[in-house]
């Protein structure tokens, strides 16, 4: 057995539904492509739906399976709407891959309270509440992993 086939048999993701937050960004798109190439069905979730759609088309052209979904992790309604949409389409979520995040390069003395709140709402609060929403689904399924 060749190494690639062996690794795919051990680490393959066939039949697994993976929700990726921040999927259209640089790191998110690379992770999403890798998950799809390992056989996962990837729900590409991000604020820029058009970029998610383009990535889904690129993954499909490479033989993978992906779908695009709008998600703003700083918006609780957006979180629940996205999770509901993914579950409706795939009937399950096996893995949540948290990639969404923002940053603004400013010195400590220059960060405005509004900037700090926006970063924390996305990077901390958003990560917590998308994980909570997906965990509820995973609890119902009696399986799942959050990364």
Where are these regions (language model features)?
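Active-site loop of short-chain dehydrogenase/reductase
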Residues: 16, 64-65, 92-93, 138-147
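Conserved glycine-rich cofactor-binding loop
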Residues: 24-26, 48
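Conserved glycine-rich Rossmann-like NAD(P)H-binding loop of the short-chain dehydrogenase/reductase
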Residues: 40-54
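The beta1-alpha1 cofactor-binding region of Rossmann-like NAD(H)/NADP(H)-dependent oxidoreductases
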Residues: 49-50, 71-82, 113
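Conserved NAD(P)H cofactor-binding loop of Rossmann-fold oxidoreductase domains
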Residues: 99-104
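Substrate-binding pocket helix/loop in short-chain dehydrogenase/reductase
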Residues: 107-108, 112-117
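A short, exposed helix-loop element centered on a Lys and neighboring polar residues
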Residues: 131-132
């Amino acid at each position: 057995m060749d190494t690639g086939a062996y690794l795919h048999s051990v680490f393959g993701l066939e039949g697994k539904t993976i929700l990726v937050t921040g999927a259209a960004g640089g790191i998110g798109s690379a992770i999403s492509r890798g998950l799809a190439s390992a056989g996962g069905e990837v729900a590409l979730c991000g604020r820029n739906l058009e970029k998610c759609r383009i990535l889904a088309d690129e993954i499909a052209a490479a033989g993978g399976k992906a779908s695009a979904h709008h998600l703003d992790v700083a918006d609780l309604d957006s979180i629940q709407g996205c999770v509901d949409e993914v579950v409706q389409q795939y009937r399950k979520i096996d893995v949540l891959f948290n990639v969404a995040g923002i940053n603004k390069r400013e010195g400590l003395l220059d960060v405005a309270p509004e900037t700090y709140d926006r970063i924390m709402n996305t990077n901390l609060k958003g990560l917590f509440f998308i994980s909570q929403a997906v965990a509820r689904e995973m609890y119902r399924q009696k399986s799942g992993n959050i990364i």
